[in-house]
Structures are given as C-alpha cells and as structure tokens.
Amino acid sequence: MSGIDPKSFGKVAVLLGGASAEREVSLNSGRLVLQGLRDAGVDAYAFDPAERPLAALKDEGFVRAFNALHGGYGENGQIQGALDFYGIRYTGSGVLGSALGLDKFRTKLVWQQLGIPTPPFEAVLRGDDYAARAQGIVAKLGLPLFVKPASEGSSVAVIKVKTADALVPALEEAVKFDKIVVVEKSIEGGGEYTACIAGDLDLPIIRIVPAGEFYDYHAKYIANDTQYMIPCGIAAEEEARLKKLARQAFDVLGCTDWGRADFMLDGEGNAYFLEVNTAPGMTDHSLPPKAARAVGISYQELVVKVLALTLKD
C-alpha cells in the first residue's frame, strides 16, 4: 500500500454512528471504511461514541482514529477536542476547522471577508418574525432561494423555495434543526460541483446532476439516478484554477488534510462556494471514492492514504 506499513498505524478506531441526524449515513460510511482498512492489514475496530464513552479509546489502547462521524459532535469540533485531550491522532480537521466547517453561517462570513465567492444570503434566528423577515429577504435576494439550518450536513432539512409564500413554512421547518438558518440566493445556470481534497492528491472535480431539484439527502444516499460527471466538463485550465480556489476556501477556515468544497457555477461560469465538508461521506454513493476511482485509486487505497495523513508531524 504505497510503501506504508499497516502496522505503523497501531490500533485504530473507526468512529461511526454517533447521535446526529446523519447517524445512518455515518454507520454506512464507517462500516465500509473499517472493511477497507482491515483489508489493507490495519488493526482497526468499530467504535460508536453514542454507545460507549470516549475514555474507552484511551483505556483500550487506541492510538489513532478514522473519523467517519457526520454532523453534530462528530464534525463540529467536540470529538476533535476530546481526541486531542486523550492524545489520539485522528483524520480530518482539528477543533477550529471542524467547528467552522460545519457552520454554514460563519463559513460564509469568513469567505466574504477574504473574497472567496459565495452566494448572497441572509441569516434568520429562531424566534424572529418570520413573515417580516421573509418579505425583506425576497425583496433583497429574489427567488428562488435555499433555506438551510446553519449546522446540519448531508442536506438535512435543506429546502428550495420558489415562491414567496413558501419561505415562511421553510423557515419554520429549518429552525427545528438549528437556531440560525441561512437563506441563500440560488445560483442557476451552470450546475453543481464538488472538489475533493485529500492531502496532496490531485483529484478531479465532479459535476453532480441530480434527477430532482437539487442534490438533497435522497439524491446523496438513496437514489440511483443521480449522475456524477467525471470529467466534469470544465476546461482543464479553468478546472485547475477552481481546484486551487477550492483548496483556498478550505484552508482559510482552518480545515486540514481532507474533505470537500462544494460550489455552483452560474450561467457565465462564475463559481460560488456553498460549504465545505470536513468529514465527507464514504458510502458507495459518496463523492471522494468516486473522484479517487477516476484517477485509479481504489477505496482501500483511499482510506489508507487518508489515515496516513495522521502520521505526519
């Protein structure tokens, strides 16, 4: 495996499950990661923090963790802080990058300040006068819009709003998941894309063409009719520029090692970054394995390469 001795990893916990709205996705990701690591000869074991205390990791001699948790405390810096406390190396971003990366509202504030293009948006707080806010938002941003809880992943509770009358019900639904809701102008005309990041690997950008309105939870993890275009149809020079911009969007949030940066193109080819993902899904529907396969890297090789990023100083 690329010159890496699987014994160099020591005893590895694959963190999976957890207690967020994305538990089932995490279980699916984690089981595949576990199988891939074991097939490569890594001494790896499943560990569900919703069922066992994290202190057991230290007590049972784990020295490294592959974080396959999605959303909630698995992705918002809490697990990362606990692993730092116990001295256990782990995949993905640290506390700051994880916390910022899961928070769409604060991500967009950082990007705006640093000139990373992102769709125009407004933030709505739980308890606001939704009717008054909706009227002002439609007047300012127009339609269609996307309504997103600030800190849920896998497109949980993301709603596309096409009419002014639909915005208030969408806000009422989204605030069930988070006290801050992002209402974002929908970027139309050029499609949805993702740039996968894994150390220094040069992975291709993927164009995502869902059968439905947008790349929602169903399209990501259930449907078989979502199309993934590799190559993505962007000219090589422009794709290289967008990869560099995606890496910058990832880095300025304090994110490290591996993840994804998702963006839209408008009808003129301008990119608008939507969010990053610091603990991407690793199911058979997920994007990083697809990008890796396109350049000849198997699932097993990918999970070992990601885990190997924990060996660096």
Swiss-Prot record:
Mg(2+) 2 binds at residues 275, 277. One of its GO terms (biological process) is peptidoglycan biosynthetic process. The keyword Nucleotide-binding applies. Mg(2+) 1 binds at residues 262, 275. Pfam families: Dala_Dala_lig_C (PF07478), Dala_Dala_lig_N (PF01820). The keyword ATP-binding applies. GO terms for cellular component: cytosol. It comes from the Bacteria. GO terms for molecular function: ATP binding; D-alanine-D-alanine ligase activity; metal ion binding. Residues 108-308 form the ATP-grasp domain. Its cofactor is Mg(2+); Mn(2+). It catalyses: 2 D-alanine + ATP = D-alanyl-D-alanine + ADP + phosphate + H(+). SUPFAM superfamilies: Glutathione synthetase ATP-binding domain-like (SSF56059), PreATP-grasp domain (SSF52440). Cell wall formation. NCBIfam families: D_ala_D_alaTIGR, PRK01372.1. This is D-alanine--D-alanine ligase. It comes from Paraburkholderia phymatum (strain DSM 17167 / CIP 108236 / LMG 21445 / STM815).
